[in-house]
């Protein structure tokens, strides 16, 4: 019953998180596109900054933007904030349910630091808080300085945090921790900067005072940051399905490169929304950077002894070697990957992959190879301490099966 409750809770939270994220990202992208497409035509209302005409769903829309505020406040205002809050709350709930509750599987790597669960959770929470505090401090002191200095400072901050996490947590835990920090920065921008600034403007209008334009300038800065951080955060969200991305020694470098690629993609669309010529030149650095990711994802895999893969299965893997490989997999993986898992509160093997017999292992050797030889994804956090020489034996088995199938 506990297992059933956990499964459904996780599923519902994931679904809610995705729905809220779509709503938040959709509205964010829409308003960035709207803002960049505004035209300062003749006949605009007093204090209006620009307007846009749009057609959708069989109707026409006339939108007018006021840079600070209109002369008279309308009776009803629609606030775009709950989407962001719901995304963060559901995301943090997932973090707690999966990564904090199962820290020994998803966060702790005993080879790096043999942390207690509570220690891993505290480090994670402190990292989330300090990530926002340092970012906010950089933005506040850089508001009137060169924008490129600000961008470089934020990039260095995230890169350093990525490296630090990769040295402390498991590869999967470190990757998701960076995503949590970025997501928290984005939501905190809405909760603590953008919305309070807009409320101050509304309060000034109600009091018949002239709103301070600084609130709009700060909100625009933070909104632009959110715009450029969105794609990297989405990438990190879906990355745990691809161990070659998150479970290699240079995964922290991959995050840094993804930050640049995501920013270039958003820059392309931001310029396109202004109706200027799209900057197609961004395709070249994107292709180059993607190639670098492809290369270092292979470079950071476990280092194994090179084996000639021309021999037949029998020549390459003697019976005793096959038995040894099976013994390694059964002893290091089958506490979870079994028809009756021994791991607490685990009813079925992950993805229903059982690794108890020789037939089980041979049938799943490609997945085993990807998770434990091409990356450090399994065992999670290396909780059963799979050594390099043991990964090498698994690699030998994989090569034997591969060669036999391709004869």
Feature roles, as predicted:
Residues 1-11, 101-116, 166-178, 241-247, ...:
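Membrane-interface interhelical loops and short amphipathic "cap" helices
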Residues 1-24, 143-186:
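Long, highly hydrophobic alpha-helical transmembrane signal-anchor segments
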Residues 15-44, 181-197:
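Hydrophobic alpha-helical membrane-embedded segments
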Residues 28-69:
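Membrane-interface amphipathic/juxtamembrane segments adjacent to transmembrane helices
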Residues 67-92, 198, 213-232:
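Loop-to-transmembrane boundary segments
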Residues 72, 79, 92, 99, ...:
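Aromatic- and Gly/Pro-enriched helix-to-coil junctions and flexible linker segments
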Residues 79, 84-103, 162-176, 229-248:
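Alpha-helical transmembrane segments and their membrane-interface junctions
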Residues 144-151, 247-251, 272-287:
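Membrane-interfacial entry segments at the cytosolic side of transmembrane helices
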């Amino acid at each position: 019953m506990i297992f059933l409750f956990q499964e459904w809770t996780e599923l519902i939270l994931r679904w809610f998180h995705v729905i809220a994220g779509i709503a938040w990202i959709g509205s964010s992208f829409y308003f960035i596109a709207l803002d960049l497409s505004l035209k300062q035509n003749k006949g605009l209302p007093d204090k209006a900054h620009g307007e846009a005409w749009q057609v959708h769903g069989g109707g026409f829309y006339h939108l007018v933007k006021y840079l600070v505020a209109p002369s008279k406040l309308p009776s009803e205002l629609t606030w775009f904030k709950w989407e962001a809050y719901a995304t963060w709350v559901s995301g943090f709930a997932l973090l707690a349910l999966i990564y904090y509750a199962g820290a020994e599987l998803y966060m702790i790597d005993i080879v790096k630091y043999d942390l207690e669960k509570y220690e891993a959770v505290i480090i994670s929470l402190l990292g989330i808080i300090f990530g926002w505090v340092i970012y906010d401090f950089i933005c506040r002191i850089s508001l009137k300085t060169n924008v490129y200095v600000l961008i470089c400072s934020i990039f260095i901050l995230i890169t350093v945090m990525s490296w630090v996490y990769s040295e402390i947590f498991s590869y999967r835990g470190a990757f998701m921790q960076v995503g949590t920090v970025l997501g928290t920065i984005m939501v905190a921008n809405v909760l603590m900067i953008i919305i309070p600034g807009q409320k101050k403007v509304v309060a000034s209008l109600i009091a018949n005072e002239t709103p301070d334009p600084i609130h709009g300038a700060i909100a625009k800065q933070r909104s632009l940051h959110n715009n450029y951080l969105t794609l990297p955060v989405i990438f990190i969200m879906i990355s745990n399905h691809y161990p070659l991305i998150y479970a290699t020694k240079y995964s922290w470098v991959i995050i840094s490169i993804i930050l640049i690629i995501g920013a270039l993609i958003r820059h392309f669309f931001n310029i396109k929304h202004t109706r200027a010529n799209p900057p197609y030149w961004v395709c070249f650095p994107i292709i180059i950077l993607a190639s670098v990711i492809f290369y270092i994802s292979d470079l950071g895999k476990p280092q194994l002894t090179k084996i000639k893969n021309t021999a037949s299965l029998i020549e390459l893997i003697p019976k005793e070697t096959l038995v040894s490989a099976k013994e390694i997999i059964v002893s290091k993986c089958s506490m979870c990957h079994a028809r009756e898992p021994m791991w607490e509160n685990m009813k079925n093997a992950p993805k229903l992959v059982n690794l108890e017999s020789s037939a089980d292992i041979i049938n799943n050797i490609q997945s085993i190879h990807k998770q434990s030889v091409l990356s450090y994804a399994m065992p999670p956090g290396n909780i059963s301490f799979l050594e390099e020489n043991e990964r090498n034996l698994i690699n030998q088995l994989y090569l034997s099966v591969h060669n036999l199938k391709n004869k």
